[in-house]
Amino acid sequence: MQPMLNIALRAARSAGELIFRSIERLDVISVNEKDAKDYVTEVDRAAEQTIVAALRKAYPTHAIMGEEGGFIEGSGEGADYLWVIDPLDGTTNFIHGVPHFAVSIACKYKGRLEHAVVLDPVRQEEFTASRGRGAALNGRRLRVSGRKSLEGALLGTGFPFRDNQIDNLDNYLNMFRSLVGQTAGIRRAGAASLDLAYVAAGRYDAFWEFGLSEWDMAAGALLVQEAGGLVSDFTGSHEFLEKGHIVAGNTKCFKALLTTIQPHLPPSLKR
């Protein structure tokens, strides 16, 4: 395992242990609303602090971008490295006791994704990847599914629910209608990093969502790519981290999904 990936995995494990211990005291955990329907808990903040401390100890000059703590500037040659952290992806699930959430850590070098960890503290599943070295689950090599069409495919998605996404709800429902009849099912589980990890593991055949932040997608996207899948924004370009919308899947299902949803895109998502 690459040294940077090993450091990231150890940091994710520490955060995951903190999160898992917190499940038993959900009734007393402090919850705040950052924005409409966007929650943060003391556990999110503590988990991010744990990760940042581990990364800063190993790589004090690297830049860090965390969902809760914002941007920490790097210095010297270390500024070319950027760690992208979501300490608790699926906070709403966590708050409600739904056991589907994850720690997500990605490392970029000069803007390119290099390492990724998505850790599920409940199922003790550790999804890891390094550029050019493949993706793994608990040390076992991952490959995307071999399904050749959307017929019988299982898809993952995220349902628009925030106020700034409601204007696109009808477009999303049209996408849903065009897909639900030809697939085995569509799942909306509430943690994009895990959804993408499931694509990498072949559990989902493809995934799409809009209105995401970089920390929601970065680690999961590299997992899919290193497992042999494709990832893009809704126009088919590679600017998904910048644009905040993503399509991912095995080669065949990715292309079929992209072709199916594109006619239903609002103008704001066609750019």
Swiss-Prot record:
Protease as UniProt keyword: no
UniProt-annotated binding residues for Mg(2+): 67, 86, 88
Disruption phenotype: Decreased expression of T3SS genes and effectors. Loss of cytotoxicity against human lung cell line A549, avirulent in a mouse infection model. Down-regulation of flagellar genes and up-regulation of T6SS structural genes and effectors, increased biofilm formation. Grows less quickly at 37 degrees Celsius. Decreased susceptibility to antibiotics neomycin, streptomycin, gentamycin, spectinomycin, ciprofloxacin and ofloxacin. Increased ribosome stalling on leader peptide PA5471.1 mRNA, leads to increased expression of PA5471 and up-regulation of the MexXY efflux system.
Reactions that this protein is recorded to catalyse: a myo-inositol phosphate + H2O = myo-inositol + phosphate
Cofactor: Mg(2+)
UniProt protein name: Nus factor SuhB
Assigned EC number: 3.1.3.25
PROSITE patterns according to UniProt: IMP_1 (PS00629), IMP_2 (PS00630)
Family of the protein in this entry: Belongs to the inositol monophosphatase superfamily.
Keyword tags: Chaperone, Cytoplasm, Hydrolase, Magnesium, Metal-binding, Ribosome biogenesis, RNA-binding, Transcription, Transcription antitermination, Transcription regulation, Virulence
Enzyme class: hydrolase
Regulation: induction: Transcription is strongly induced during mouse infection.
